[in-house]
Amino acid sequence: MNLILTLKRPFIWLSRIRHRCGYGVHSPFAFELITCLIYEKTPYYAYKELEAEEEKQKRNHGKGWKSESRKVTRLLFRLVNRVQPDTIVDAGVPSSSSLYLQSGKATADYTFASELSELFLEAGVPVDLLYIHKAKDPSFVEEVFRICAARSTQQSVFVIGGIHYSGAM
């Protein structure tokens, strides 16, 4: 049975390849998100400057600075650039993602919180973009999500990293 599946697998892949770029998606929003944001390969104007700044921050902060993958940081930059949020909340460990989130829209109010006690949000201000990346602490993720979900709008975007880290996530 394994041999048959092994022989069929390339043909299954070939039959599905036309849907790879989102052409099987019916929602216009999801189609644009897949084709123009996730699969985007064009280098943006700020990538080189951000990578240089990231290297400088790594040298200055040492082990207290988490370097995220280029793929994730660039996706976050493109997401902020596309959505143009007024309020960005970055909850988790200090990392290179903060540079990319802030430079996507320089005029946005940026809030970083590594602990719940640091999460200060003004009353009545909605959270337009939330990035949670502290997978080792599921209670922190749940509490930040609960706080920010109460302040979300229809245009709010939540990005949660490490959801497969543990069963509790």
Task: List where the protein language model places each region.
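A short alpha-helical cap/connector motif
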Residues: 1-129, 135-159, 163-169
